[in-house]
């Protein structure tokens, strides 16, 4: 407790003596702790009863009650000191003056008689001398815990009383007033020992600060008294150190709230024992044995106990005064009980309010304690007017010392009537209760600061507030900018979405337009190809007819029978082929699209794919065998048209692929968006589906697989034919006896029938392919037809050429057409005839079955054809004749082809112009 007290010395100098009045002021002590300190001091002083300096509690209330200028009696010798007294004391507030005037009315003559003190001149000088000696060496440590004043010392020097009966009187409190009444009889004995009392009082009053008596003069000092005083001072210092230690221990006990009521009971019991021992105690015993027990207890901010130094002889006091004081004491005890209850309730309320938390204005007022708040001003003034310790006060309040000069005016009034005390105490107590509730016992850390430091702190606080405002403004600005950026970004995203939607719509429109254009182009191309096919068909029919007519003429010139050829001129071969081609054209252009649910992209894609594949196959076939009947210029034109078709198909395929990739990319993009919504990505290579093993042969394209299958079947057929031909039974049959040959017409008919029978599977295969590929173009059909007809013509030409060479040297039998069949087998060799020229009569005896078999073998194997394999030819002359006939035939065909080209080209140009003009 002592470490938290900050002591400030406030010197007040007087003009005459120059002595310093020292007083301590506790500045940073909360009122609650100060109250605890007073309790502890009273407890220790009552319990131990140690000798210490006299404790007084001078307050402004004493001044208010007892200042009475009518009762002031001062000797002429001390009159010069009054100006200094007036100078040293502080000015009294108007409220205090008003209360003083109010208190004057209640002071009676009885009270003035009880408050009178008589001193002789010698005793007064002796007291002044001892007081002045004690004031010189007083220290701040002695006054640290016990603040002193002499507010109740009143001097009066009258000429009526004798000089040996001058006594200083102690004005006692109501609690000890009965002690004075009962000690009147014992005061006569103290006259002989007054000098001893003076010495004791001088020793005990060493701690008293400079007051009004320091200006009344100085006398010679006694050395023995000084030495005694020094010894007493040392002793008192030791006692004070021990007292401080005890107070610290007591403060630790007071910090425990559960022990408060026990200590209060102990103090109250001790006070009661003190009141009971009033009959056995004299004033000398009180002064000598227990000076620390003479304390001031205030209730309702009015003195209940006042002690004074008693150096007086008997003064006659009335007996009724003691009964009145006993009644007052009883009332005071009741008030004290009420105060205990009120204080208990107040502490409970304070605990409740402190548990709720401190208010903001109290906190701000705590940190700005030196600023002039009206609440704090009223709080300080109320404290200075009313100090309310609970039971026993060890040291006076801080604010009482600031107005200590108010006590220096001596009064003769002793007490105020109890009714007036209660009347004055109630509003004051209410005010004190309000102030105690308002103050929250906060420790003020800025109480000792300079105003400059407080201003500096204010400036720092203002700067900090400005800095905080700037930071909040920056944060708000950043938030606003972020919000604007977010809005701008949303707008841009919406614009981008709208732009993408517009682009998507434009692309969709463009795609539809491209599809429409593609359909129109395809329709135009189909019309063109149909017209071209019709013109080619008509030209080919005309060429075939002319060729057959020329052949018939040539055969007729050579002497052959051409009746069968004339009959068949418009017969099976050309009519059948042209009819079948017409049916194929009708099937390709048949309105199947109109009779089923259509998907345009799929149909067009299939058409273009089939067309491209068929185009490649047709091109390969044309390269393998180009017919000499179609002119070269027409072939070039056909290749150009085919190349244009292939390029268009490729472009369409690319467009289809692009659109498919776009769709796939859109699907992937949406899939990515869906994946973004999923919090977890799928694991890789987990639970993969098992794939079926696919052999390499099945990985080829469909068209290539078909070609491979066809090649395989063809190879198997060739192998079977070879095995059958090399069979030994077949060879022995050929070596058997030859029957009679039929007529030449029968052989020719049989031979033609065999050719037709052999060509039928080829046609059926081609038509089965056409049925599979319905979307095959008419141009391809034309190529296939022309290829087939060319192969038929070539073989017929070969046969006719052979027969012509055979019949030309021997024209004896012109009416018979005997086909020449080459064979390695020798029948009935004639030694005169050449080996390669068998006799005609031998041929008549040949078996027709063998002839048919040989013809089949001849047409099956191209390897044994003498035109294709010249090494097999043994008769060079005959071969040369055959080749010569073929060259002549070729020259005639070429000439006919040129004539047809010159006739067909202007016709085709006119047809194309008419076709373009129609569109």
UniProtKB/Swiss-Prot annotation:
One of its GO terms (cellular component) is midbody. GO terms for biological process: cell division; ciliary transition zone assembly; cilium assembly; establishment of mitotic spindle orientation; microtubule bundle formation; microtubule cytoskeleton organization involved in mitosis; microtubule nucleation; mitotic metaphase chromosome alignment. Keywords: Cell cycle, Cell division, Cell projection, Cilium, Cilium biogenesis/degradation, Coiled coil, Cytoplasm, Cytoskeleton, Disulfide bond, Microtubule. Expressed in retina and blood. Expressed in retina, mainly in photoreceptors but also in outer plexiform and ganglion cell layers (at protein level). Residues 145-166, 456-505, 724-744, 762-816 are annotated as: Disordered. GO terms for molecular function: microtubule binding; protein homodimerization activity. InterPro entries: CCD66, CCDC66_dom. Residues 150-161 have a biased composition (Polar residues). Residues 570-919 are annotated as: Mediates localization to cilia, centrosomes and spindle microtubules and the interaction with PCM1, CEP290, CEP104 and CSPP1. Its main location: cytoplasm. It is found in: Cytoplasm, Cytoskeleton, Microtubule organizing center, Centrosome; Cytoplasm, Cytoskeleton, Microtubule organizing center, Centrosome, Centriolar satellite; Cell projection, Cilium; Cytoplasm, Cytoskeleton, Cilium basal body. Residues 467-558 form a coiled coil. Microtubule-binding protein required for ciliogenesis. May function in ciliogenesis by mediating the transport of proteins like BBS4 to the cilium, but also through the organization of the centriolar satellites. Required for the assembly of signaling-competent cilia with proper structure and length. Mediates this function in part by regulating transition zone assembly and basal body recruitment of the IFT-B complex. Cooperates with the ciliopathy proteins CSPP1 and CEP104 during cilium length regulation. Plays two important roles during cell division. It is linked to Defects in CCDC66 are the cause of generalized progressive retinal atrophy (gPRA), characterized by continuous degeneration of photoreceptor cells leading to night blindness and progressive vision loss. A homozygous mutation in the CCDC66 gene resulting in a frameshift and the production of a truncated protein is probably causing the disease. Homodimer; disulfide-linked. Interacts with CEP290. Interacts with PCM1. Interacts with ARMC9, TOGARAM1, CSPP1 and CEP104. Interacts with CDK5RAP2, CEP152, CEP192, TBG1 and PRC1. This is Coiled-coil domain-containing protein 66.
């Amino acid at each position: 407790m002592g470490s938290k007290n900050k002591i400030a010395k406030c010197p007040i100098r007087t003009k005459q003596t120059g002595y310093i009045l020292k007083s301590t002021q506790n500045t940073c002590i909360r009122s609650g702790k100060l109250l605890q300190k007073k309790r502890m001091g009273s407890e220790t002083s009552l319990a131990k009863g140690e000798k210490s300096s006299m404790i007084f509690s001078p307050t402004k209330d004493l001044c208010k009650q007892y200042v009475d200028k009518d009762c002031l009696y001062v000797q002429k010798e001390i009159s010069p000191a009054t100006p200094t007294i007036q100078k040293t004391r502080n000015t009294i507030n108007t409220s205090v003056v008003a209360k003083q005037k109010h208190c004057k009315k209640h002071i009676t003559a009885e009270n003035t008689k009880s408050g009178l003190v008589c001193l002789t001149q010698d005793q007064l000088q002796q007291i002044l001398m001892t007081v002045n000696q004690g004031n010189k060496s007083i220290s701040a440590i002695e006054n640290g815990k016990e603040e002193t004043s002499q507010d109740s010392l009143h001097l009066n020097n009258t000429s009526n009383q004798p000089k040996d009966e001058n006594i200083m009187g102690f004005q006692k409190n109501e609690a000890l007033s009965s002690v004075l009444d009962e000690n009147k009889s014992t005061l006569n004995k103290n006259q002989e020992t007054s000098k001893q009392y003076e010495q004791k009082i001088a020793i005990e009053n060493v701690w008293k600060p400079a007051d009004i008596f320091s200006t009344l003069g100085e006398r010679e000092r006694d050395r023995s008294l000084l030495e005694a005083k020094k010894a007493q001072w040392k002793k008192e210092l030791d006692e004070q150190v021990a007292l401080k230690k005890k107070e610290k221990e007591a403060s630790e006990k007071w910090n425990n709230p559960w022990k408060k009521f026990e200590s209060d009971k102990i103090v109250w019991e001790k006070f009661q024992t003190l009141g009971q021992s009033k009959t056995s105690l004299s004033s000398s015993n009180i002064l000598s044995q227990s000076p620390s027990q003479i304390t001031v207890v205030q209730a309702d901010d009015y003195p209940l106990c006042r002690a004074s130094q008693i150096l007086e002889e008997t003064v006659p006091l009335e007996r009724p005064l003691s009964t009145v004081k006993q009644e007052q004491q009883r009332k005071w005890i009741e008030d004290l009980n009420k105060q205990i209850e009120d204080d208990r309730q107040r502490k409970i309320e304070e605990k409740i309010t402190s548990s709720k938390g401190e208010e903001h204005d109290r906190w701000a007022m705590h940190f700005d304690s030196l600023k002039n708040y009206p609440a704090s001003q009223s709080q300080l003034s109320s404290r200075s007017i009313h100090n309310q310790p609970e039971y026993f006060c060890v040291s006076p309040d801080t604010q009482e010392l600031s107005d200590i000069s108010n006590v220096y005016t001596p009064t003769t009034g002793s007490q105020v009537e109890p009714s007036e005390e209660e009347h004055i105490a109630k509003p004051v107590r209410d005010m004190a209760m309000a102030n105690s509730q308002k103050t929250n016992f906060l420790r003020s850390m800025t109480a000792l600061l300079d105003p400059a430091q407080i201003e500096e702190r204010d400036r720092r606080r203002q700067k900090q507030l400005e800095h905080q405002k700037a930071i909040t403004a920056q944060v708000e600005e950043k938030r606003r900018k972020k919000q604007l950026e977010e809005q701008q970004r949303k707008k841009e995203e919406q614009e981008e979405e709208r732009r993408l939607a517009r682009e998507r719509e434009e692309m969709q429109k463009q795609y539809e337009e491209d599809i429409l254009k593609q359909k129109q182009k395809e329709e135009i191309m189909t019309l063109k190809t149909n017209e071209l096919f019709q013109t080619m068909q008509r030209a080919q029919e005309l060429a075939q007819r002319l060729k057959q007519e020329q052949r018939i003429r040539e055969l007729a010139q050579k002497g052959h029978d051409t009746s069968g050829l004339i009959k068949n001129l418009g017969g099976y071969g050309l009519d059948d082929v042209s009819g079948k081609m017409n049916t194929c054209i009708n099937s390709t252009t048949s309105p199947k699209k109109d009779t089923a649910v259509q998907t345009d992209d799929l149909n067009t894609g299939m058409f273009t794919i089939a067309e491209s594949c068929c185009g490649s196959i047709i091109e390969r076939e044309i390269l393998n065998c180009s017919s000499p009947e179609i002119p070269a210029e027409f072939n070039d034109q056909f290749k150009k048209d085919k190349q244009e078709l292939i390029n268009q198909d490729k472009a369409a395929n690319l467009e289809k692929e692009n659109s498919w990739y776009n769709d796939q990319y859109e699907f992937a993009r949406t899939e990515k968006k869906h994946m973004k919504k999923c919090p977890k990505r799928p694991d890789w290579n987990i639970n993969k589906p098992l794939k079926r093993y696919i052999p390499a042969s099945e990985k080829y394209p469909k068209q290539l697989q078909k070609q491979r299958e066809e090649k395989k079947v063809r190879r198997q057929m060739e192998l079977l034919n070879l095995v059958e031909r090399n069979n030994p039974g077949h060879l022995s049959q050929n070596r058997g006896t030859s029957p009679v040959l039929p007529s030449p017409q029968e052989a020719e008919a049989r031979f033609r029938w065999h050719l037709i029978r052999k060509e039928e599977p080829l046609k059926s295969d081609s038509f089965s392919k056409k049925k599979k590929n319905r979307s095959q173009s008419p141009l391809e059909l034309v190529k296939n037809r022309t290829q087939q007809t060319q192969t038929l013509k070539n073989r017929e030409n070969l046969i006719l050429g052979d027969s012509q060479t055979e019949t030309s040297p021997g024209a004896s039998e012109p009416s018979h057409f005997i086909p020449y069949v080459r064979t390695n087998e020798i029948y009935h060799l004639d030694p005169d005839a050449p080996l390669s020229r068998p006799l005609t009569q031998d041929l008549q005896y040949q078996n027709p079955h063998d002839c048919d078999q040989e013809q089949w073998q001849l047409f099956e194997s191209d390897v044994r054809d003498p035109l294709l394999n010249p090494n097999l030819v043994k008769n060079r002359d005959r071969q040369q004749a055959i080749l010569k006939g073929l060259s002549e035939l070729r020259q005639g065909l070429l000439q006919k082809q040129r004539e047809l080209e010159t006739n067909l080209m202007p016709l085709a140009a006119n047809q194309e112009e008419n076709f373009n003009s129609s569109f």
